[in-house]
Amino acid sequence: MVLEKLKEENTVIALIGASNDKQKYGNKIYCDLRSKGYNVVPINPKEKLIEGDKAYTSIEEMESLPDIANFVVPPPVAMKITPHISELGIKHLWFQPGSESKELETWLKNTEGIKYLINSCIMVETR
């Protein structure tokens, strides 16, 4: 279901953990999706710009909610913010390899209405 949402026209992706550090996947994923024409919005509480584009400190700052939240953050951060993001009404969640945990997987399985991908790289899926 998340892959289908990704293929819809005008889908907005919030990249939680976007980074200016070219060595980090938060930067690689952001640049990759942007180069492929995806509407990707960088989320990072410590940055004002990511690759010259306005970065938001949180999803709530965005002008409208994204269709997909893509996580490229450590597992404790993903677990901490996922319930809140779900409560906002974002139901398509994508967890990059390394952002998941057993606790998160259990929460996702026990939460109705959430469509999610774990251990699947968005750069690979969009080739």
Question: Can you say where each PLM-predicted feature lies in the sequence?
Answer:
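Hydrophobic, well-ordered beta-alpha structural blocks that scaffold small-molecule cofactor pockets
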Residues: 1-44, 51
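A short helix->loop->beta-strand "cap" motif at the edges of active sites that frequently abuts
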Residues: 38, 88-92, 111-114
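Short, charged, surface-exposed secondary-structure boundary motifs
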Residues: 50-53, 67, 103-106, 125-127
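Active-site regions of enzymes building and remodeling cell-envelope glycoconjugates
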Residues: 52-60, 114
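Mid-chain, well-packed structural core segment of small domains
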Residues: 59, 63-99
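Rossmann-fold NAD(P)-binding glycine/threonine-rich loop
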Residues: 97-125
